[in-house]
Amino acid sequence: MRCPFCGNIDTQVKDSRPAEDHVSIRRRRFCPACGGRFTTYERVQLRDLVVIKTSGKREDFDRDKLERSIRISMQKRPIDPERIDQMISGIVRRLESMGETDIPSKKIGEIVMEALARIDTVAYVRFASVYKNFQAADDFEDFVHELRPPSPPTEE
């Protein structure tokens, strides 16, 4: 592993342990050339995934981008960060185990929405507002109305 401080290629692992999400390894490293210390994370990647955007453009799957968008939708929500990490890891595992290396962005969005709907309705609506490109308050209202079960008829 290259040292981020001086570029030296020969760094030493001083400590390895499972990370808090239990799907990656946290390694503390030391550079004998400059004395720098840094942390790396290692996780299993089953296959290289390519995202096919709605425009047809192809780009490498970026777990960090997925994580950022999910965390934005969950800002200021009472959700344990470890649960968020587990959800993200579950989504990535599901994508990697689909058997396809090319995955439409629409499919990724659907999988994320399924996961968010099980955890937090507000985060689900926030994510949907970006994913489904809401343009007006009516879009929110229609979407939320679809979430609610029909009210029983009132007797007058």
Swiss-Prot record:
Binds 1 zinc ion. NCBIfam families: transcriptional regulator NrdR (TIGR00244). Keywords: ATP-binding, DNA-binding, Metal-binding, Nucleotide-binding, Repressor, Transcription, Transcription regulation, Zinc, Zinc-finger. A zinc finger (unnamed) spans 3-34. This is Transcriptional repressor NrdR. Pfam families: ATP-cone (PF03477), Zn_ribbon_NrdR (PF22811). GO terms for molecular function: ATP binding; DNA binding; zinc ion binding. Negatively regulates transcription of bacterial ribonucleotide reductase nrd genes and operons by binding to NrdR-boxes. Residues 49-139 form the ATP-cone domain. GO terms for biological process: negative regulation of DNA-templated transcription. Disulfide bonds: none annotated. The keyword Nucleotide-binding applies. The lineage of its organism: Bacteria, Pseudomonadati, Pseudomonadota, Alphaproteobacteria, Rhodobacterales. InterPro entries: ATP-cone_dom (IPR005144), NrdR-like_N (IPR055173), RNR_NrdR-like (IPR003796). Its cofactor is Zn(2+). Belongs to the NrdR family. HAMAP family: NrdR.
